[in-house]
Amino acid sequence: MSFSVVIPARYASQRLPGKPLQLISGKPMIEHVYNCAQRSAASRVVVATDDQRVFDAVTGFGGDVLMTSAEHPSGTDRLQEVVSQLKLGDDEIIVNVQGDEPLIPAEVINQVARNLQSNSAASAATLCEPITAFEDVINPNVVKVVCDDQNFAHYFSRAPIPWDRDVYAKFGTHSANQISTAHSATRRHIGIYAYRVALLHQFVLWPSGVLENIEKLEQLRIIANGLKIHVQDACAEVPGGVDTPEDLSRVRVRFGDI
């Protein structure tokens, strides 16, 4: 299995400025993500950034990094620039590991690449995991996914999907019964993707769709254009990424900093 990992890392963040360079156990967060990716079976790991400070930090720890445009409307557009700079072939597989996932397991990176490689009908692959807390079900920052019987994604949403009409009608929306009954089929989408390079070149030519603009979920553009995303349950726990100062504190606790 041959694949490359690209780690998009933007310095600007409304909720956590300078996020890639926030220190965890004395190292910038982006270095932890890079090291996780290096432990996978990837033939190459490269950071894609639009900020000189991130570029310098990555070169400082000996990592591979590319400078990209600051004008990209989405992370997928940034990936397309990277594969163009690297002159990768249409059939090659790229795994997009988010730059705010310092605890991403290497085996999960391998899994999503293998998932795409073994599903020729899919143009992309991603992962999910069961939701076990009702607060996650109703949290719009926790993206949910529903799939068909072949595990191709039907839809991604910030809303609680699927909605069990009968259980909610019986127990209401604040009952502990909801987790064991109404949400046994509810899956949290894990934001790691494997793409065939050809899809990335197509993606940047498509306009954003109505549902993508409503949900603010760019993966919906792939489904809207008739292509398939294959989804598997992750083979290992994937701790949430770092979006807020509270998330950063949680990760620092996991590293023993606090």
Curated annotation (Swiss-Prot):
CDD domains recorded: CMP-KDO-Synthetase
One GO BP annotation of this record: lipopolysaccharide biosynthetic process
InterPro entries to which the protein is assigned, alphabetical: Cytidylyl_trans, KdsB, Nucleotide-diphossugar_trans
EC number per UniProt: 2.7.7.38
Coiled coil: none
UniProt keyword list: Cytoplasm, Lipopolysaccharide biosynthesis, Nucleotidyltransferase, Transferase
GO molecular-function terms, A-Z: 3-deoxy-manno-octulosonate cytidylyltransferase activity
Pathway as given in its UniProt record: Nucleotide-sugar biosynthesis; CMP-3-deoxy-D-manno-octulosonate biosynthesis; CMP-3-deoxy-D-manno-octulosonate from 3-deoxy-D-manno-octulosonate and CTP: step 1/1; Bacterial outer membrane biogenesis; lipopolysaccharide biosynthesis
GO cellular component: cytosol
Compartments where located: Cytoplasm
Catalytic reaction equation(s): 3-deoxy-alpha-D-manno-oct-2-ulosonate + CTP = CMP-3-deoxy-beta-D-manno-octulosonate + diphosphate
Highest taxon of source: Bacteria
UniProt entry tagged with the keyword Nucleotidyltransferase: yes
Family affiliation: Belongs to the KdsB family.
Function: Activates KDO (a required 8-carbon sugar) for incorporation into bacterial lipopolysaccharide in Gram-negative bacteria.
Designated name of the protein: 3-deoxy-manno-octulosonate cytidylyltransferase
